[in-house]
Amino acid sequence: NVEWKNVADQSELIDVLNNNNSAIAIFDMHGGHSDNGEGFLVLQNKAINISSLLGKIKIPPIVILSACDTSPIDNNHYSVANMFLLAGAKTVLASALPIMSKQASVYIARLLIRVSIFLYIHLFKHNKSIRWSTFISGMTKQSYYTELIYKLQDCKIINGKQNQELNFFVN
């Protein structure tokens, strides 16, 4: 089950998180990191520092951040990703660089499909466990190759039939 919540401000965010019993929370919004400060997410054009929510929110074990610069490699450790870890998340998927909204949306859709179908089959039909890192890294590799294949087609290096064959092979 996927439940979508749009929040307008910090108090709504706190309420939604504290009333959430899901294993995964996905934040699909603008994000960033100030030059000398900390990472932030943007709600209704207002930057929210996750550190200001520490001790006020209940965080699910898995947090997915579909927002730019939520774990930047060129700034301090006060990133959005690290703040969610401090708030109680067991794992956080974040971006080190700016991301494109279309590709981020496709990635999130693939993640939701992979969780609901692949993970379910793997765990309950085959009775096998899988490490979260293996699950995510496999999906990320597949997403990378899919984007690369589409880029090759856009640049006229391969045709549509080759795109289909390569995507079938990769996925």
Give each language-model segment a name.
Residues 1-27, 32-53:
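Functional beta-strand-loop-alpha-helix junction segments that form "active/interaction loops"
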Residues 18-20, 51-58, 79-88:
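Mature extracellular/periplasmic domains of secretome proteins
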Residues 21-24, 33, 57, 88, ...:
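Alpha-helix capping/termination and helix-coil
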Residues 22-28, 58-60, 95-96:
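Functionally constrained cores in energy, signaling, and assembly domains
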Residues 31-32, 37-39, 55, 88, ...:
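Residue-identity detector for glycine
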Residues 61-171:
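Active-site-proximal C-terminal subdomain of hydrolase catalytic domains
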